[in-house]
Amino acid sequence: MEMLQKRKHQTIDETSLNNLIENEKKKIKSLLAFGVPKECVLSRSFTPCELLGPERDHLGMLMFRLETDAESPKFLLISVLFLAMNAFNVSFCTRTSLANLYKTSLVDSINTMLDSCSYLEEKVSLFGVTNYISQGTNCLISCVMQGHVYDVRKENIYGLVILKDLLLEPDWEPRQNAIQYIYLCYIYRQAFNKIEYGIYIVLSELTHEEVLIDLLRNKFSKERFMFMNYLINGDGNLNYFGSLQRIGHCKTQNIKSGILDLQGISLTIIRLKDVFVELCERKIFL
């Protein structure tokens, strides 16, 4: 009782309340005038232009850093479309179309390097979403790691371009929430006595990775069973079935379908407008 008597209460009169309301109105007007925040965290690097296909003309692509284990260059940049060429969840027709877009000796060397990995994550890590690519023998690539994918003048937002074959929506009722969280997911399966990878861009309203991982286990129960069987009878060095990494979020209303026309080849895509990129920690699961 004594503590309650000592507690002080601030009284707000009509003038003070009106001042608070006016301050809030000014903040809202400021946000409406300048739009979404334009600050972002960028990563930049050079990479041979012969590793780039559609990425040069279409910004808003996921890029990955590939460790080469060589003295020079120590790493290269490749896109999600490059990785999709060998993913088991991509249709044969789409893989063939992508292979026609990447036809150099360096591409063959990179594919051989990727085939030697037990897990893709051993050599490949997320670099960001492209917002600028220069032209030349070696291209300077600028990627957004956190923030909206603005162009260099910060006038336009590119969003995120996703190959439709890679899209996965595991929610019971997809796109019912106003916000969709975007995840990068790798799934591994056993086929012809070897391990193959699948790469997915997952859209979900779930923010708790553990709950989403349970949904993915259920979704890929067949692949998981085959993988576990391979672990028991085969290579004991493998220790996880998949991985999940949140890469950003966007409004559900900004998810649009489209077509990407490239050198006479048409690819069905999903375009996520006004994406906020935020590369989080990767989680593995069995």
Swiss-Prot record:
Keywords per UniProt: Capsid protein, Host nucleus, Virion
Keyword set includes Lipid biosynthesis: no
TM spans (from-to): none
Record-level Gene Ontology MF annotations: DNA binding
This protein's GO CC annotations: host cell nucleus; viral capsid
Pfam families: Herpes_VP19C (PF03327)
Localization (cell): Virion; Host nucleus
Keyword flag Acetylation: no
GO biological process: viral capsid assembly
Protein family per UniProt: Belongs to the herpesviridae TRX1 protein family.
Subunit structure: Interacts with TRX2, MCP and capsid vertex component 2/CVC2.
Protein role: Structural component of the T=16 icosahedral capsid. The capsid is composed of pentamers and hexamers of major capsid protein/MCP, which are linked together by heterotrimers called triplexes. These triplexes are formed by a single molecule of triplex protein 1/TRX1 and two copies of triplex protein 2/TRX2. Additionally, TRX1 is required for efficient transport of TRX2 to the nucleus, which is the site of capsid assembly.
Name of the protein: Triplex capsid protein 1
Encoding gene, per UniProt annotation: TRX1
